[in-house]
Swiss-Prot record:
This is Thiamine-phosphate synthase. Mg(2+) binds at residues 84, 103. Its cofactor is Mg(2+). Its EC number is 2.5.1.3. Binds 1 Mg(2+) ion per subunit. It comes from Haemophilus influenzae (strain ATCC 51907 / DSM 11121 / KW20 / Rd). Signal peptide: none annotated. Condenses 4-methyl-5-(beta-hydroxyethyl)thiazole monophosphate (THZ-P) and 2-methyl-4-amino-5-hydroxymethyl pyrimidine pyrophosphate (HMP-PP) to form thiamine monophosphate (TMP). It is an enzyme of class 2 (transferase). It comes from the Bacteria.
Length: 226
């Protein structure tokens, strides 16, 4: 059985669009940041490469980058998750896939492979969580956005940190990772409210020292581990 809680304490999400401030070589930018984040102690990485500043419109380059990211994660023993793109995830044998409410149904994803694929599901409302709680195919929920975020186009309404507590009080038992504008100062409260971890983008990609920032986030999350 997969120990999902073990991979959620510090869940890093990124694509080339999140690293364009580092220079023109989009692929190298992401690989550089990812390596530093792995050195700093991330417990999971989600390849989320989408939008007009990404490699979304050059699939061959995007696939090559995804494979490089996967291989780098494997060097560190860190799970590699693909966002939304089920075909890519299966083709390159990613460790998991993360999908939203309007993406491919989780039952269909699970039916596509007999391998122990990790499946994450985005949740923005209590009723969504209650539905997902009863779906055995789902391994964890990505709850957000907790705070306003510029990393996602047309984000859903912000939830606030107390929403994690609301879910736990409502009987939601699946592993939860909080995402959306999460910073170091929020980690303690989110963990205390019942999150199994935090998912971050800019808290790592825009850090002056990626490895040090990652280490601080990991230590803060581990300090309040259950």
């Amino acid at each position: 059985m997969k120990n999902i809680q073990k991979i959620l304490p510090l869940y890093f999400v990124a694509g080339t669009q999140d690293c364009r401030h580092l220079g023109e070589n989009l692929s190298e930018n992401l690989l550089f940041v990812l390596k530093q984040a792995l050195e700093g102690g991330i417990t999971c990485f989600q390849f989320r490469d989408k939008g007009k500043f990404s490699l979304e419109h050059t699939p061959s380059a995007q696939k090559a980058l995804a494979i490089n990211c996967r291989d780098l994660c494997r060097e560190y023993g860190v799970p590699f998750i693909v966002d939304d793109n089920v075909d890519l995830a299966l083709e390159i044998e990613a460790d998991g896939i993360h999908v939203g409410q309007s993406d491919m149904p989780v039952q269909e994803i699970r039916a596509k492979t007999d391998k122990p694929l990790i499946i994450g599901w985005s949740v923005n409302r209590l009723d969504e969580a209650k539905i997902g709680e009863n779906l055995a195919e789902i391994d964890y929920f990505g709850i957000g956005p907790i705070f306003p975020t510029q990393s996602k186009e047309n984000p859903k309404p912000t939830l606030g940190m107390a929403f994690i507590q609301t879910l736990r009080n409502a009987g939601i038992t699946k592993p939860l990772v909080a995402i959306g504008g999460v910073k170091l100062a929020h980690v303690k409260t989110l963990r205390e409210f019942g999150a199994d971890g935090v998912a971050v983008i800019t808290a790592i990609t825009h850090a002056d020292n990626v490895q040090a920032a990652t280490k601080a986030l990991r230590e803060a999350s581990d300090e309040y581990a259950k």
